[in-house]
C-alpha cells in the first residue's frame, strides 16, 4: 500500500475574506444571544462588528415605534452587556467597544418582513451581480411579494421599473430622497 501522507489543498483566501467570515460568525452568535432579550416595544434591526482604526466596535442597532431615546440605549446597554459576557466560548478575538444605537434614517432592511413594511419607501439596493449593467438601484419600492422587489428608479431623467429577485440582493437599506 502506497502512503503519500496527507493531501493539502491550497486555496488563496484574502485576509479580508477571512476577517469577513469570522465577523459573520461573531454577528450570528451575538444575534442569537441578544434577540430573545430585546423585548417589545424594541426591535433588533441589525448587529455589526467592524474594525475602526485599531478598535473593534460591536454595534447593536435597535428601534421602536416613535424612535429610540438616549435613555432607551442606556437601558438596553445595561441588558445586553452582561449577556455578551456570558457567551462561552468567548467569540471575540479582541477587546471591543459596545455601541447600542438607533439605525438612523438609512436603516438596513434585513428581513422579508422589513421589506414588506418598507413598500412605498425610498430604498437603496445593492446586488451580488449586476442587472442590465447596474449593481446598485435607488428608488421607490413599489412592491415586494417575498420573492421579487419592484423598484421605480430614475435612469438619468427617465423613470424605469426593475424587478429584482430577492436572492440577488446583497444589501438593502432605507435611503434619503434628495
Swiss-Prot record:
Cited CDD domains: YlxS_C (cd01734)
Gene Ontology BP annotations: ribosomal small subunit assembly; translation
Record family assignment: Belongs to the RimP family.
Role of this protein: Required for maturation of 30S ribosomal subunits.
Native organism: Streptococcus pyogenes serotype M1
Domain of life: Bacteria
Gene: rimP
InterPro entries cross-referenced by the UniProt entry: Ribosome_maturation_RimP, RimP_C, RimP_C_sf, RimP_N, RimP_N_sf
Annotated protein name in UniProt: Ribosome maturation factor RimP
Location of the protein in the cell: Cytoplasm
Keyword Cytoplasm among record annotations: yes
NCBIfam families on file: PRK00092.1-2
Keyword list, A-Z: Cytoplasm, Ribosome biogenesis
Amino acid at each position: 500500500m502506497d502512503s503519500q501522507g496527507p493531501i493539502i489543498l491550497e486555496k488563496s483566501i484574502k485576509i479580508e475574506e477571512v476577517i469577513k467570515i469570522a465577523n459573520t460568525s461573531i454577528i450570528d452568535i451575538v444575534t442569537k444571544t441578544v434577540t430573545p432579550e430585546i423585548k417589545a416595544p424594541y426591535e433588533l434591526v441589525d448587529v455589526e462588528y467592524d474594525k475602526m482604526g485599531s478598535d473593534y466596535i460591536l454595534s447593536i442597532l435597535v428601534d421602536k415605534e416613535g424612535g429610540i431615546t438616549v435613555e432607551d440605549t442606556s437601558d438596553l446597554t445595561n441588558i445586553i452587556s452582561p449577556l455578551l459576557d456570558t457567551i462561552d466560548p468567548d467569540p471575540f478575538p479582541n477587546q471591543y467597544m459596545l455601541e447600542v444605537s438607533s439605525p438612523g434614517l438609512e436603516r438596513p432592511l434585513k428581513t422579508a418582513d422589513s421589506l414588506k413594511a418598507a413598500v412605498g419607501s425610498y430604498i437603496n439596493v445593492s446586488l451580488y451581480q449586476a442587472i442590465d449593467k447596474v449593481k446598485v438601484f435607488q428608488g421607490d419600492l413599489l412592491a415586494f411579494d417575498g420573492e421579487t422587489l419592484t423598484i421605480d428608479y430614475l435612469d438619468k431623467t427617465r423613470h424605469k421599473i426593475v424587478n429584482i429577485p430577492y436572492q440577488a440582493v446583497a444589501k438593502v437599506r432605507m435611503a434619503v430622497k434628495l
